[in-house]
Amino acid sequence: MVDTTKNTKLFTSYGVTTSKAVNPDMVAKMISKAKRPLFVVGTGVLRPEVLDRAVKIAQKANIPIAATGSSLKGFLDKGVDAKYINLHQLGFYLTDPAWPGLDGKGNYDTIIVLEFKKYYINQVLSGTKNFSNVKAISIGRDYIQNATMSFGNISREDHYAALDELIDNL
């Protein structure tokens, strides 16, 4: 079992509510309990090692994929259905309870984020944390303080092992 709760020290933590560090088994439980989950992926997912795991996560948990940046091509090349959306626009939409979602069935209650630059996703999740009831779970290598839950700062090898463990637990 990979310990993904390590290395979560913050340097700017005064007055900030930070995310809870979690292990892959807890993430799997949260995904299974979500009523309307959405898997949000960034451009970093195009690395073959990560893309294969992202596809397995989405398929095994039956989660729709919101591809941001240039990540859509990787999923389309693998024959996986994914919808493109700008990350900042998605963050804005998630704060609107009346948003119909990417599939027209309503807003999402949980988002799972993977492979974003830390400084970029933290800003988007700041909006969802403060202006919506959406739970955000980061399964990337970096600890994301504005997520509801996040893996800690882990090595690439530990990250791959954690994603494999998550897939096994779904």
From Swiss-Prot:
One Pfam family here: CO_dh
Entry keyword Disulfide bond: no
InterPro entries: CdhB, DHS-like_NAD/FAD-binding_dom
Keyword field: Methanogenesis
Gene Ontology terms describing biological process: methanogenesis, from acetate
pH dependence, record text: Optimum pH is 8-9.
Pathway of action: One-carbon metabolism; methanogenesis from acetate
Presence of the UniProt keyword Nucleotide-binding in the record: no
Functional description taken from the UniProt entry: Part of a complex that catalyzes the reversible cleavage of acetyl-CoA, allowing growth on acetate as sole source of carbon and energy. The alpha-epsilon subcomponent functions as a carbon monoxide dehydrogenase. The precise role of the epsilon subunit is unclear; it may have a stabilizing role within the alpha(2)epsilon(2) component and/or be involved in electron transfer to FAD during a potential FAD-mediated CO oxidation.
Family statement: Belongs to the CdhB family.
Subunit structure: Heterotetramer of two alpha and two epsilon subunits. The ACDS complex is made up of alpha, epsilon, beta, gamma and delta subunits with a probable stoichiometry of (alpha(2)epsilon(2))(4)-beta(8)-(gamma(1)delta(1))(8).
Protein name listed in UniProt: Acetyl-CoA decarbonylase/synthase complex subunit epsilon 1
Biological source species: Methanosarcina mazei (strain ATCC BAA-159 / DSM 3647 / Goe1 / Go1 / JCM 11833 / OCM 88)
Upper classification of the organism: Archaea, Methanobacteriati, Methanobacteriota, Stenosarchaea group, Methanomicrobia
